[in-house]
């Protein structure tokens, strides 16, 4: 099976890239694509760059040029739910934009005109990730909503405002909704799997710098388990 894995930063893709066999890397429009073999699958690893525009552009190139059957977006995120800690892993059930507001025209907050309010992750991929999470003993793995915006959520006031908009939000980051929207348009199944590098609003910038590598390791190890179970 041809599976695409997307991470925004070098720290988020380095470990998985090192695990690929027969790896070949090429750069298209500034985006790094590495093809290789892992767990019996052909894997295309994309380093997309940070933010929604980079994520949307690179995911479009990915789907047009490499035509993966499924897409997994991995990396770090900021935790939003009160039950979460740094290092925990969140599996998306749904992804939304948290910085889109066209409510003046009767759209839901976060809804892009012409798009659904949220983008549902593939149920089979979520179920598979759930199966893998049962084997995790040292970290908490949960599933829920992830929201995306082009900002790092270190301001407690902004965090509170987003919480008011999305009651059941588990994590925030800067690429997933763009990846999900492109996959939705191309009708390619996707899931977002993110490990928490910080808890949004609580000295997030300090925590992010300290725990990014830990988050990358947790998310990569979990991705490998999913690939091993994927048939």
Curated annotation (Swiss-Prot):
Reported EC number(s) for this entry are 3.2.2.9
Positions contributing to substrate binding: 78, 153, 174-175
Which BP terms does GO give this entry? L-methionine salvage from methylthioadenosine; L-methionine salvage from S-adenosylmethionine; nucleoside catabolic process
Annotated metabolic or biological route of this protein: Amino-acid biosynthesis; L-methionine biosynthesis via salvage pathway; S-methyl-5-thio-alpha-D-ribose 1-phosphate from S-methyl-5'-thioadenosine (hydrolase route): step 1/2
Keyword set for this entry?
Amino-acid biosynthesis, Hydrolase, Methionine biosynthesis
Where do the catalytic residues lie?
12, 198
Against InterPro entries, the record matches this protein to: MTA_SAH_Nsdase, Nucleoside_phosphorylase_d, Nucleoside_phosphorylase_sf
* Reaction catalysis annotation: S-adenosyl-L-homocysteine + H2O = S-(5-deoxy-D-ribos-5-yl)-L-homocysteine + adenine; S-methyl-5'-thioadenosine + H2O = 5-(methylsulfanyl)-D-ribose + adenine; 5'-deoxyadenosine + H2O = 5-deoxy-D-ribose + adenine
**One cellular component term from this protein's GO annotations in UniProt:** cytosol
Q: What class of enzyme is it?
A: hydrolase
List the GO molecular function terms.
adenosylhomocysteine nucleosidase activity; methylthioadenosine nucleosidase activity
Q: Which family does it belong to?
A: Belongs to the PNP/UDP phosphorylase family. MtnN subfamily.
| Primary role | Catalyzes the irreversible cleavage of the glycosidic bond in both 5'-methylthioadenosine (MTA) and S-adenosylhomocysteine (SAH/AdoHcy) to adenine and the corresponding thioribose, 5'-methylthioribose and S-ribosylhomocysteine, respectively. Also cleaves 5'-deoxyadenosine, a toxic by-product of radical S-adenosylmethionine (SAM) enzymes, into 5-deoxyribose and adenine.
According to UniProt, the name of this protein is 5'-methylthioadenosine/S-adenosylhomocysteine nucleosidase
